[in-house]
Amino acid sequence: MKQTPLNARHRALGARMVEFGGWDMPVQYAGIIAEHKATREGAGLFDISHMARFWVTGPDSERFIQLIDTFDISKTAIGQSDYGIMCYEDGGIVDDIFTYHLGPDEWMVVANAGNAEKDWAWLNQHTAGYDVVLTDRSQELAMIALQGPKAESLLAPLTDADVVNLAFHGITKATVEGAAGYISRTGYTGEDGFELFLPAGEIERIWDRLLEVGATPIGLGARDSLRFEPGLALYGHEIERDINPYEAKLGWVVKLDKGPFIGSEALHDIKANGPVRTLVGLEMTGRGIARQGYPVVALDGSELGVVTTGMPSPSLGKNLAYALVKAGSLKIGAEVDVLIREKPVRATVVKTPFYKARYKK
Protein backbone atom coordinates (compact mmCIF):
# COMPACT_ATOMS: atom_id res chain seq x y z
CA MET A 1 0.00 0.00 0.00
CA LYS A 2 1.10 3.54 -0.70
CA GLN A 3 1.70 5.90 2.21
CA THR A 4 1.34 9.68 2.42
CA PRO A 5 4.15 11.72 4.01
CA LEU A 6 1.96 11.96 7.15
CA ASN A 7 1.58 8.21 7.70
CA ALA A 8 3.78 8.16 10.82
CA ARG A 9 1.84 11.09 12.27
CA HIS A 10 -1.47 9.26 11.90
CA ARG A 11 -0.08 6.22 13.68
CA ALA A 12 1.42 8.36 16.47
CA LEU A 13 -2.02 9.94 16.96
CA GLY A 14 -3.57 6.48 17.37
CA ALA A 15 -5.57 6.57 14.14
CA ARG A 16 -7.33 3.45 12.92
CA MET A 17 -5.81 2.83 9.49
CA VAL A 18 -7.57 1.33 6.46
CA GLU A 19 -6.83 0.73 2.78
CA PHE A 20 -8.45 3.38 0.55
CA GLY A 21 -7.77 3.62 -3.18
CA GLY A 22 -4.51 1.73 -2.70
CA TRP A 23 -3.40 3.99 0.16
CA ASP A 24 -2.89 3.35 3.88
CA MET A 25 -5.15 6.06 5.32
CA PRO A 26 -6.66 7.06 8.70
CA VAL A 27 -10.39 6.28 8.88
CA GLN A 28 -10.76 7.79 12.35
CA TYR A 29 -8.88 9.14 15.36
CA ALA A 30 -11.17 10.03 18.32
CA GLY A 31 -14.27 8.80 16.47
CA ILE A 32 -16.31 9.70 13.40
CA ILE A 33 -19.10 11.63 15.15
CA ALA A 34 -16.69 13.64 17.33
CA GLU A 35 -14.53 14.46 14.29
CA HIS A 36 -17.57 15.41 12.21
CA LYS A 37 -18.79 17.82 14.90
CA ALA A 38 -15.28 19.24 15.42
CA THR A 39 -15.24 20.22 11.73
CA ARG A 40 -18.77 21.65 11.70
CA GLU A 41 -18.07 23.68 14.88
CA GLY A 42 -14.31 24.36 14.81
CA ALA A 43 -11.50 23.40 12.45
CA GLY A 44 -10.79 19.92 11.11
CA LEU A 45 -7.42 18.94 9.63
CA PHE A 46 -7.39 16.33 6.86
CA ASP A 47 -4.53 14.51 5.14
CA ILE A 48 -5.58 14.38 1.49
CA SER A 49 -2.14 13.75 0.00
CA HIS A 50 -3.52 10.56 -1.54
CA MET A 51 -5.32 12.69 -4.14
CA ALA A 52 -3.67 13.35 -7.52
CA ARG A 53 -2.06 16.67 -8.45
CA PHE A 54 -1.38 17.03 -12.17
CA TRP A 55 0.16 20.14 -13.77
CA VAL A 56 -0.90 21.15 -17.28
CA THR A 57 1.40 23.74 -18.86
CA GLY A 58 2.12 25.09 -22.32
CA PRO A 59 0.52 27.38 -24.93
CA ASP A 60 -2.47 25.03 -25.44
CA SER A 61 -3.10 24.29 -21.75
CA GLU A 62 -6.46 26.08 -21.61
CA ARG A 63 -7.62 24.58 -24.92
CA PHE A 64 -6.59 21.11 -23.70
CA ILE A 65 -8.51 21.41 -20.43
CA GLN A 66 -11.54 22.63 -22.40
CA LEU A 67 -11.34 19.33 -24.31
CA ILE A 68 -11.31 17.05 -21.26
CA ASP A 69 -13.47 19.09 -18.84
CA THR A 70 -17.24 19.64 -19.02
CA PHE A 71 -16.90 23.06 -17.38
CA ASP A 72 -16.04 26.23 -19.32
CA ILE A 73 -12.68 27.19 -17.83
CA SER A 74 -12.18 30.06 -20.31
CA LYS A 75 -13.83 32.19 -17.61
CA THR A 76 -11.60 30.86 -14.80
CA ALA A 77 -9.24 33.76 -14.05
CA ILE A 78 -5.67 33.29 -12.81
CA GLY A 79 -5.98 32.74 -9.06
CA GLN A 80 -9.34 30.99 -9.38
CA SER A 81 -10.47 27.36 -9.61
CA ASP A 82 -13.56 25.50 -10.76
CA TYR A 83 -15.21 22.12 -10.30
CA GLY A 84 -15.73 20.01 -13.40
CA ILE A 85 -16.12 16.50 -14.75
CA MET A 86 -14.18 14.41 -17.24
CA CYS A 87 -16.53 12.28 -19.33
CA TYR A 88 -16.23 9.39 -21.72
CA GLU A 89 -17.63 9.80 -25.25
CA ASP A 90 -20.93 8.24 -24.11
CA GLY A 91 -21.33 10.74 -21.25
CA GLY A 92 -20.28 8.35 -18.48
CA ILE A 93 -17.97 9.84 -15.87
CA VAL A 94 -14.20 9.31 -15.89
CA ASP A 95 -13.80 11.39 -12.72
CA ASP A 96 -14.73 14.68 -11.12
CA ILE A 97 -11.90 17.19 -10.90
CA PHE A 98 -10.91 20.62 -9.65
CA THR A 99 -8.94 22.79 -12.08
CA TYR A 100 -6.83 25.61 -10.61
CA HIS A 101 -5.57 28.44 -12.84
CA LEU A 102 -2.12 29.13 -11.38
CA GLY A 103 -0.63 31.44 -13.99
CA PRO A 104 -0.36 32.11 -17.73
CA ASP A 105 -0.48 28.69 -19.42
CA GLU A 106 -0.27 26.94 -16.04
CA TRP A 107 -3.03 24.85 -14.48
CA MET A 108 -3.27 22.25 -11.74
CA VAL A 109 -5.83 19.43 -11.98
CA VAL A 110 -6.73 17.67 -8.72
CA ALA A 111 -8.34 14.24 -9.12
CA ASN A 112 -9.47 11.37 -6.91
CA ALA A 113 -6.92 9.00 -5.38
CA GLY A 114 -8.60 5.81 -6.58
CA ASN A 115 -8.70 7.16 -10.14
CA ALA A 116 -5.20 8.68 -10.26
CA GLU A 117 -3.61 6.16 -12.65
CA LYS A 118 -6.68 5.99 -14.87
CA ASP A 119 -6.96 9.80 -14.98
CA TRP A 120 -3.26 10.25 -15.73
CA ALA A 121 -3.55 7.79 -18.63
CA TRP A 122 -6.76 9.51 -19.83
CA LEU A 123 -5.09 12.93 -19.93
CA ASN A 124 -2.05 11.56 -21.74
CA GLN A 125 -4.24 9.78 -24.31
CA HIS A 126 -5.67 13.12 -25.47
CA THR A 127 -2.61 15.37 -25.84
CA ALA A 128 -2.12 14.75 -29.58
CA GLY A 129 -2.42 18.06 -31.42
CA TYR A 130 -2.04 20.11 -28.23
CA ASP A 131 1.15 21.94 -27.24
CA VAL A 132 1.02 20.95 -23.57
CA VAL A 133 3.25 19.34 -20.97
CA LEU A 134 1.69 17.11 -18.29
CA THR A 135 3.56 16.70 -15.00
CA ASP A 136 2.51 14.52 -12.08
CA ARG A 137 3.50 16.42 -8.91
CA SER A 138 1.53 14.23 -6.50
CA GLN A 139 4.65 12.92 -4.73
CA GLU A 140 6.48 16.23 -4.63
CA LEU A 141 3.63 18.28 -3.14
CA ALA A 142 1.62 17.08 -0.16
CA MET A 143 -2.00 18.18 0.24
CA ILE A 144 -3.87 18.86 3.47
CA ALA A 145 -7.24 20.49 4.15
CA LEU A 146 -8.22 22.77 7.03
CA GLN A 147 -12.01 23.00 7.15
CA GLY A 148 -14.62 24.57 9.40
CA PRO A 149 -15.76 27.93 10.79
CA LYS A 150 -12.49 28.42 12.69
CA ALA A 151 -10.19 27.46 9.78
CA GLU A 152 -9.57 31.05 8.69
CA SER A 153 -8.65 32.34 12.16
CA LEU A 154 -6.26 29.40 12.76
CA LEU A 155 -4.52 29.64 9.39
CA ALA A 156 -4.23 33.43 9.01
CA PRO A 157 -1.42 33.96 11.59
CA LEU A 158 0.68 31.14 10.09
CA THR A 159 0.88 32.40 6.51
CA ASP A 160 1.98 35.43 4.51
CA ALA A 161 -1.10 35.02 2.27
CA ASP A 162 -4.20 37.15 2.85
CA VAL A 163 -6.48 34.19 3.49
CA VAL A 164 -9.14 36.42 5.09
CA ASN A 165 -9.79 38.05 1.70
CA LEU A 166 -9.08 34.99 -0.46
CA ALA A 167 -12.18 34.47 -2.60
CA PHE A 168 -14.27 31.29 -2.61
CA HIS A 169 -12.50 28.90 -5.02
CA GLY A 170 -9.53 31.29 -5.04
CA ILE A 171 -5.93 30.04 -5.00
CA THR A 172 -2.77 31.95 -4.15
CA LYS A 173 0.94 31.34 -3.80
CA ALA A 174 1.70 31.25 -0.09
CA THR A 175 4.29 30.51 2.54
CA VAL A 176 3.00 28.62 5.57
CA GLU A 177 5.41 28.60 8.51
CA GLY A 178 8.27 28.98 6.03
CA ALA A 179 7.07 26.31 3.57
CA ALA A 180 6.32 27.66 0.08
CA GLY A 181 3.36 26.40 -1.93
CA TYR A 182 -0.28 27.26 -2.56
CA ILE A 183 -3.43 27.83 -0.50
CA SER A 184 -6.91 27.54 -2.04
CA ARG A 185 -10.31 28.32 -0.54
CA THR A 186 -11.78 24.97 -1.54
CA GLY A 187 -12.87 21.84 0.28
CA TYR A 188 -15.15 18.84 0.53
CA THR A 189 -17.11 19.40 3.74
CA GLY A 190 -19.78 22.03 3.09
CA GLU A 191 -17.91 24.41 5.40
CA ASP A 192 -15.59 27.34 4.75
CA GLY A 193 -12.02 26.17 4.61
CA PHE A 194 -8.76 25.80 2.77
CA GLU A 195 -6.64 23.25 0.96
CA LEU A 196 -2.87 23.57 1.26
CA PHE A 197 -0.40 22.34 -1.35
CA LEU A 198 3.05 22.25 0.28
CA PRO A 199 6.37 20.40 -0.16
CA ALA A 200 6.13 16.80 1.04
CA GLY A 201 9.29 17.20 3.10
CA GLU A 202 7.77 20.08 5.09
CA ILE A 203 4.28 18.73 5.68
CA GLU A 204 4.84 16.95 9.02
CA ARG A 205 5.98 20.22 10.57
CA ILE A 206 2.99 22.15 9.18
CA TRP A 207 0.58 19.40 10.30
CA ASP A 208 2.01 19.51 13.84
CA ARG A 209 1.74 23.31 13.96
CA LEU A 210 -1.90 23.31 12.84
CA LEU A 211 -2.76 20.75 15.55
CA GLU A 212 -0.84 22.88 18.06
CA VAL A 213 -2.97 25.97 17.31
CA GLY A 214 -6.24 24.07 17.73
CA ALA A 215 -7.14 22.02 14.66
CA THR A 216 -8.59 18.53 15.16
CA PRO A 217 -7.27 15.61 13.04
CA ILE A 218 -10.05 14.13 10.89
CA GLY A 219 -10.14 10.71 9.22
CA LEU A 220 -11.85 9.44 6.08
CA GLY A 221 -14.95 8.34 8.00
CA ALA A 222 -15.91 11.89 8.96
CA ARG A 223 -14.71 13.18 5.59
CA ASP A 224 -17.40 10.96 4.07
CA SER A 225 -20.21 12.07 6.42
CA LEU A 226 -19.19 15.73 6.02
CA ARG A 227 -19.39 15.54 2.21
CA PHE A 228 -22.56 13.43 2.31
CA GLU A 229 -24.74 15.91 4.22
CA PRO A 230 -24.32 18.83 1.75
CA GLY A 231 -24.62 16.44 -1.21
CA LEU A 232 -21.06 16.45 -2.56
CA ALA A 233 -20.61 13.54 -4.97
CA LEU A 234 -18.11 10.73 -4.38
CA TYR A 235 -16.74 8.66 -7.26
CA GLY A 236 -17.90 5.07 -6.99
CA HIS A 237 -21.13 6.23 -5.34
CA GLU A 238 -23.05 9.18 -6.87
CA ILE A 239 -20.78 9.32 -9.92
CA GLU A 240 -19.36 6.38 -11.86
CA ARG A 241 -18.51 5.00 -15.31
CA ASP A 242 -22.17 4.20 -16.03
CA ILE A 243 -23.65 7.38 -14.48
CA ASN A 244 -23.77 10.66 -16.40
CA PRO A 245 -23.67 14.17 -14.88
CA TYR A 246 -27.37 14.83 -15.49
CA GLU A 247 -28.35 11.71 -13.57
CA ALA A 248 -26.03 12.78 -10.73
CA LYS A 249 -27.67 16.26 -10.56
CA LEU A 250 -24.41 17.77 -11.83
CA GLY A 251 -25.79 19.23 -15.06
CA TRP A 252 -24.74 22.67 -13.79
CA VAL A 253 -21.08 21.83 -14.51
CA VAL A 254 -21.80 20.73 -18.10
CA LYS A 255 -21.38 23.75 -20.39
CA LEU A 256 -22.59 22.53 -23.78
CA ASP A 257 -22.40 26.02 -25.30
CA LYS A 258 -18.60 26.28 -24.88
CA GLY A 259 -17.88 24.17 -27.97
CA PRO A 260 -17.04 20.48 -28.48
CA PHE A 261 -15.41 18.48 -25.69
CA ILE A 262 -15.12 14.77 -24.96
CA GLY A 263 -18.65 13.49 -24.38
CA SER A 264 -20.41 16.69 -25.47
CA GLU A 265 -22.47 15.06 -28.23
CA ALA A 266 -23.80 12.35 -25.93
CA LEU A 267 -24.45 14.84 -23.13
CA HIS A 268 -26.35 17.11 -25.54
CA ASP A 269 -28.66 14.18 -26.38
CA ILE A 270 -29.06 13.17 -22.72
CA LYS A 271 -30.03 16.72 -21.79
CA ALA A 272 -32.46 17.00 -24.71
CA ASN A 273 -34.18 13.69 -23.95
CA GLY A 274 -33.93 13.92 -20.17
CA PRO A 275 -31.87 11.53 -18.02
CA VAL A 276 -33.19 8.00 -17.50
CA ARG A 277 -32.35 8.10 -13.79
CA THR A 278 -32.05 10.81 -11.16
CA LEU A 279 -30.58 11.21 -7.70
CA VAL A 280 -33.02 11.63 -4.79
CA GLY A 281 -32.70 12.01 -1.04
CA LEU A 282 -34.27 9.53 1.37
CA GLU A 283 -35.00 9.74 5.08
CA MET A 284 -35.42 6.36 6.73
CA THR A 285 -38.66 6.26 8.73
CA GLY A 286 -38.35 2.55 9.48
CA ARG A 287 -35.52 1.15 11.60
CA GLY A 288 -32.37 0.59 9.58
CA ILE A 289 -29.51 2.23 7.73
CA ALA A 290 -29.61 2.31 3.93
CA ARG A 291 -26.18 1.35 2.58
CA GLN A 292 -24.71 1.58 -0.91
CA GLY A 293 -26.14 -1.04 -3.24
CA TYR A 294 -29.37 -1.65 -1.32
CA PRO A 295 -32.37 -1.80 -3.71
CA VAL A 296 -35.04 0.91 -3.56
CA VAL A 297 -38.52 -0.35 -4.45
CA ALA A 298 -42.04 1.06 -4.68
CA LEU A 299 -44.55 -0.02 -2.05
CA ASP A 300 -45.87 -2.62 -4.51
CA GLY A 301 -42.36 -4.10 -4.71
CA SER A 302 -41.51 -2.86 -8.21
CA GLU A 303 -37.88 -1.82 -8.73
CA LEU A 304 -37.05 1.89 -8.67
CA GLY A 305 -33.30 2.06 -8.20
CA VAL A 306 -30.43 1.68 -5.78
CA VAL A 307 -28.85 3.49 -2.81
CA THR A 308 -25.58 5.29 -3.67
CA THR A 309 -24.65 6.43 -0.14
CA GLY A 310 -26.47 6.06 3.17
CA MET A 311 -25.59 6.67 6.81
CA PRO A 312 -26.75 8.26 10.05
CA SER A 313 -26.28 12.04 9.72
CA PRO A 314 -24.27 13.33 12.71
CA SER A 315 -25.49 16.91 12.14
CA LEU A 316 -29.18 16.10 11.71
CA GLY A 317 -29.62 12.99 13.83
CA LYS A 318 -31.46 11.12 11.07
CA ASN A 319 -30.73 8.08 8.92
CA LEU A 320 -30.41 9.50 5.41
CA ALA A 321 -29.46 8.25 1.97
CA TYR A 322 -29.00 9.22 -1.64
CA ALA A 323 -30.49 6.88 -4.23
CA LEU A 324 -30.31 6.72 -8.01
CA VAL A 325 -33.85 5.97 -9.21
CA LYS A 326 -35.96 6.00 -12.37
CA ALA A 327 -36.43 9.61 -13.47
CA GLY A 328 -39.88 11.01 -12.72
CA SER A 329 -40.83 8.07 -10.51
CA LEU A 330 -40.68 9.85 -7.14
CA LYS A 331 -41.75 13.22 -5.78
CA ILE A 332 -40.87 14.85 -2.46
CA GLY A 333 -42.92 13.16 0.27
CA ALA A 334 -43.33 9.86 -1.61
CA GLU A 335 -42.85 6.69 0.40
CA VAL A 336 -40.62 3.84 -0.76
CA ASP A 337 -39.02 0.75 0.72
CA VAL A 338 -35.30 0.13 0.98
CA LEU A 339 -34.47 -3.57 0.99
CA ILE A 340 -32.10 -4.11 3.91
CA ARG A 341 -30.95 -7.74 3.81
CA GLU A 342 -34.00 -8.36 1.58
CA LYS A 343 -36.38 -6.95 4.22
CA PRO A 344 -38.38 -3.83 3.20
CA VAL A 345 -37.74 -0.82 5.44
CA ARG A 346 -39.81 2.33 4.89
CA ALA A 347 -38.28 5.63 3.73
CA THR A 348 -39.59 9.01 2.58
CA VAL A 349 -38.27 11.08 -0.32
CA VAL A 350 -36.96 14.39 1.05
CA LYS A 351 -35.40 17.57 -0.32
CA THR A 352 -31.68 17.67 -0.97
CA PRO A 353 -29.11 18.68 0.01
CA PHE A 354 -29.69 17.56 3.58
CA TYR A 355 -27.35 20.25 4.95
CA LYS A 356 -26.93 23.80 3.63
CA ALA A 357 -23.28 24.48 2.84
CA ARG A 358 -21.74 27.41 4.71
CA TYR A 359 -19.12 28.66 2.29
CA LYS A 360 -17.64 32.15 2.62
CA LYS A 361 -18.54 33.84 -0.65
From Swiss-Prot:
Pfam families associated with the record: GCV_T, GCV_T_C
* Transferase is among the record's keywords: yes
Q: Does the keyword Manganese apply?
A: no
What Gene Ontology molecular function terms does this protein carry? aminomethyltransferase activity; transaminase activity
EC number(s) on file: 2.1.2.10
According to its UniProt entry, the protein's GO biological process terms are: glycine decarboxylation via glycine cleavage system
What does the record give as the reaction this protein catalyses?
N(6)-[(R)-S(8)-aminomethyldihydrolipoyl]-L-lysyl-[protein] + (6S)-5,6,7,8-tetrahydrofolate = N(6)-[(R)-dihydrolipoyl]-L-lysyl-[protein] + (6R)-5,10-methylene-5,6,7,8-tetrahydrofolate + NH4(+)
Q: Which family does it belong to?
A: Belongs to the GcvT family.
Quaternary structure and interacting proteins, as annotated: The glycine cleavage system is composed of four proteins: P, T, L and H.
**What is the protein name given in its UniProt record?**
Aminomethyltransferase
Q: Which organism is it from?
A: Herpetosiphon aurantiacus (strain ATCC 23779 / DSM 785 / 114-95)
